[in-house]
C-alpha cells in the first residue's frame, strides 16, 4: 500500500511539472531582414483574388513594426486582412491584421499602424 501511495505521489508531481510549460510565453516575433524579402502583399481574405503589393517604403514600415514587437499575446481572432511575406529563399510567413493587432499564428501584438496597412489595400486594389 505504501508503494502505491508513493507511486501516485510521484505521478502527480511529474504530471504537474510537465504541464507547467504547456503554453510557453512568446515575447517577440521572429525578426525579419528586409534584404531577404522578395515581396509583401496584402489580401482581404485568405483566398482572395485581389492582391496589393507593398512598395519598398511600405515593406520597411512593416518590417520595422514586426521587428519592434516587444510583447505578444496569445489570442484567437478573425482577421480583417492577411499579409504575406515572401522571401527570396522561397519561405513565406503569413500575418493576420485585425482592427488593432498584427498576428502570426495565434500570437498577436497591439499596434497603432493597422490603418496604415489597411489603407495600402484600399487605395491600391488590383485583380490578379
Predicted regions span which residues?
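Function-determining sites in protein domains
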Residues: 19-128
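Sec-dependent bacterial lipoprotein signal peptides
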Residues: 1-21
Amino acid at each position: 500500500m505504501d508503494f502505491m501511495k508513493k507511486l501516485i505521489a510521484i505521478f502527480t508531481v511529474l504530471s504537474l511539472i510537465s504541464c507547467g510549460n504547456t503554453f510557453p510565453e512568446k515575447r517577440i516575433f521572429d525578426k525579419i531582414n528586409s534584404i531577404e524579402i522578395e515581396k509583401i502583399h496584402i489580401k482581404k481574405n485568405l483566398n482572395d483574388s485581389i492582391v496589393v503589393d507593398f512598395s519598398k517604403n511600405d515593406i520597411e514600415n512593416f518590417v520595422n513594426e514586426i521587428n519592434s514587437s516587444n510583447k505578444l499575446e496569445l489570442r484567437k481572432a478573425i482577421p480583417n486582412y492577411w499579409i504575406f511575406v515572401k522571401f527570396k529563399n522561397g519561405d513565406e510567413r503569413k500575418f493576420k491584421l485585425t482592427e488593432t493587432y498584427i498576428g502570426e499564428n495565434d500570437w498577436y501584438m497591439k499596434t497603432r499602424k493597422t490603418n496604415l496597412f489597411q489603407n495600402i489595400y484600399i487605395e491600391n486594389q488590383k485583380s490578379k
